[in-house]
């Protein structure tokens, strides 16, 4: 499979029409376990995906307690922001395809969010574990 501008353009169209204003594309070759094999026994327990974002995409501050996350910008520009448990921004990284810093590694347990700065930005995301929806306790609730 080629990962090229044709694929990116197709995903941008899908993201534009999505209520969430983003679209992901699973890059795992074996997303589902074969019949008779439990998912915990299945070899590919990672997450590898493209995620296409619009500037009005909302990604709340959250964390992943069981895995780190790698984010690399393939097209466009985003800002990755790190937060402490009190909701204070502790760092931010401007990530730009072809720029000085196209990617960042988000440590396990680090509160963070991504802000899309260019419509149709395409990021590659990788996590160590199989997809598990972030529980409500993993979203940062800021009370001021």
Range-by-range predicted roles:
Residues 50, 70, 113-114:
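Short, surface-exposed charged micro-motifs
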Residues 49-66:
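Conserved short histidine dyad/triad with adjacent acidic residue
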Residues 87-94, 98, 111-144:
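Double-stranded beta-helix
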Residues 66-86:
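Glycine- and acidic-residue-biased ligand/ion/polar-headgroup-sensing regions
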Residues 60-62, 80-82, 103-106, 112-117, ...:
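Short beta-strand His + acidic residue motifs that chelate non-heme Fe in jelly-roll/DSBH
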Residues 1-45, 91-96:
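A short, N-terminal "cap"/entry segment at the start of jelly-roll beta-barrel domains
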């Amino acid at each position: 499979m080629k990962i090229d501008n044709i694929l990116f353009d197709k995903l941008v169209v899908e993201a534009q029409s999505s209520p969430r204003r983003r679209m992901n594309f699973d890059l795992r070759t074996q997303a589902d376990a074969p019949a008779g094999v439990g998912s915990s026994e299945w070899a590919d327990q990672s997450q590898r995906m493209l995620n296409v974002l619009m500037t009005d995409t909302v990604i709340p501050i959250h964390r992943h307690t069981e895995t780190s996350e790698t984010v690399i910008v393939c097209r466009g520009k985003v800002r990755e922001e790190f937060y402490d448990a009190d909701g204070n921004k502790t760092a931010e990284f401007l990530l730009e395809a072809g720029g000085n810093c196209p990617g960042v590694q988000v440590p396990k347990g680090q509160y963070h969010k991504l802000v899309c700065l260019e419509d149709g930005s395409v990021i590659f995301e990788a996590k160590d574990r199989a997809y598990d929806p972030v529980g409500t306790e993993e979203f940062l609730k800021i009370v001021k």
